[in-house]
């Protein structure tokens, strides 16, 4: 289910008529939920507190929510939490090795990602239910899928008649005049996602490319993936109720009803096999730069030893010096990135080896890479050209040039070129300055550089 606040009459004030398909579909879905007389409704929402490496579950016995931040404080509701379910789910997740629980609450109020669908449910559902509100995280798709399995196991063990609502919009980049603009990936994501909903082909939720999703500005995918896991190895009846995007954001409503066991729908195992094959293919096509970065980190993390430059490296790696950045990703999500603007080692090979180890163990944004993560790490190596000063933004190009912003006190921020989600020079400079602790009002200089990227 999507969660546009404008669909609530007190917020939309008539504008909700422009998404009448979604309104009507919401009412049908709410009536279906009401007919099931659920004891517990679990909502997955991307707008509760989120963490990169932790799946938050709202704590406490009850909570209130309103649309005050959207100009309608009178549109409000209060909910009773299913504390027994929350405790049991936390335990199931712990047994599965999934970091989830009630720690880290910041705002106890019910967010609009949950409040929008529950407003419709409350209109249709006259029997009382208890709520479980689950956030998403920056962890990979398999973690979210397995978390969904924990939700289903919890409901079964407690004997709870449970409905899961996967709250999330699709792409936010469907129209040039929309609030987030247009990207060609937007309509394509929505097409593929709605096809997956119509066919209950949940494998697609697990295999979307992360950079593609960033370009499409996707909101709901982790929610959908948790829901998919809750229906692991279960045959489904699918009722695709609506899709539209008149405001530039994709809204889809789809209902799934379990029909019984179906072992062929074990998408978690299928995804692991898919990922294994894809990684083997990637490892087989590595060039010398990427292979050296991988071997360096694997030796340090796995054996505690730094490697020497292996025989057979290209002359350019041994005879030239350059700044190097090594980036690590896991499940398409950044896992570490460290490097040097100018060369600090004897040659490019030594620069790669040192930066690879640092990216995996010394990036302050992340915990060090663990040995069991090594098979899932994807490496890229950027070899930097010499920086050159620029005097205006017209000399910059986010696809072609990286930027270095420097200010007094040794402050320096660097951003590599051609990064997903960074489409303008202003955004590129803003991020580089933020990384360097540089304010727009400070006196600063800008340099540009090109890279040769090895992936």
Predicted features, each with a name:
Residues 341-368:
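A short mixed-secondary-structure module that forms the rim of ligand-binding clefts
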Residues 361-390:
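Catalytic phosphate-donor-binding core of small-molecule kinases
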Residues 47-49, 170-171:
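Catalytic metal-binding/acid-base residues of hydrolase active sites
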Residues 40-42, 163:
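Structural motif
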Residues 281-323:
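Short, basic/aromatic recognition patches
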Residues 135-189, 328-348:
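Active-site beta-strand/loop microenvironment that shapes enzyme catalytic pockets
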């Amino acid at each position: 289910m999507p969660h546009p606040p404008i669909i609530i009459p007190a917020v939309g004030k008539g504008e909700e008529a422009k998404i009448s398909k979604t309104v009507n579909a919401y009412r049908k879905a709410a009536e279906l939920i009401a007919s099931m007389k659920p004891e517990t409704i679990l909502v997955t929402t991307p707008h509760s507190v989120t963490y990169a490496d932790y799946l938050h579950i709202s704590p406490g016995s009850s909570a209130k929510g309103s649309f005050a931040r959207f100009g309608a404080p009178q549109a409000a509701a209060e909910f009773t939490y299913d504390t027994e379910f929350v405790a049991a789910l936390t335990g199931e997740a712990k047994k599965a090795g999934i970091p989830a629980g009630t720690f880290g609450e910041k705002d106890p109020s019910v967010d609009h990602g949950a409040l929008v669908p529950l407003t419709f449910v409350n209109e249709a559902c006259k029997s009382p239910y208890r709520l479980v509100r689950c956030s998403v995280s920056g962890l990979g798709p398999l973690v979210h899928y397995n978390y969904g399995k924990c939700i289903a196991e919890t409901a079964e063990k407690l004997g709870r008649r449970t409905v899961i609502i996967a709250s999330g919009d699709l792409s936010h980049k469907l129209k040039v005049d929309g609030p987030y603009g247009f990207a060609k990936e937007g309509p394509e994501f929505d097409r593929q996602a709605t096809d997956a909903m119509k066919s209950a082909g949940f494998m697609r939720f697990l295999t979307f490319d992360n950079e593609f999703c960033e370009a499409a500005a996707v909101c709901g995918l982790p929610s959908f993936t948790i829901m998919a896991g809750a229906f692991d190895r279960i045959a489904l009846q699918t009722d695709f109720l609506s899709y539209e995007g008149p405001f530039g954001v994709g809204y889809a409503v789809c209902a799934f009803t379990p029909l019984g066991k179906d072992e062929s729908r074990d998408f978690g195992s299928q995804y692991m096999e898919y990922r294994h094959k894809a990684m083997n293919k990637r490892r087989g096509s590595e060039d010398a730069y990427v292979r050296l970065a991988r071997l360096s980190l694997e030796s340090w993390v796995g054996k505690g030893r730094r490697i020497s430059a292996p025989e057979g490296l290209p002359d350019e790696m041994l005879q030239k010096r350059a700044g190097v950045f090594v980036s690590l990703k896991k499940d398409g999500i950044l896992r570490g990135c460290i490097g040097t603007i100018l060369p600090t080692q004897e040659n490019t090979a030594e620069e790669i080896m040192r930066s690879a180890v640092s990216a995996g163990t010394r990036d302050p944004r992340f915990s060090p890479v663990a040995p069991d993560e090594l098979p899932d790490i994807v490496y890229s190596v950027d070899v930097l050209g010499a920086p050159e000063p620029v005097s205006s933004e017209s000399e910059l190009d986010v696809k072609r040039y990286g930027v270095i912003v420097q200010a007094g006190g040794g402050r320096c921020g660097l951003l590599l070129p051609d990064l997903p989600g960074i489409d303008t020079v202003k955004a590129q400079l803003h991020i580089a300055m933020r990384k360097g602790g540089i304010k727009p009002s400070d006196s600063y200089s800008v340099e540009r550089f090109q890279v040769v990227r090895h992936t």
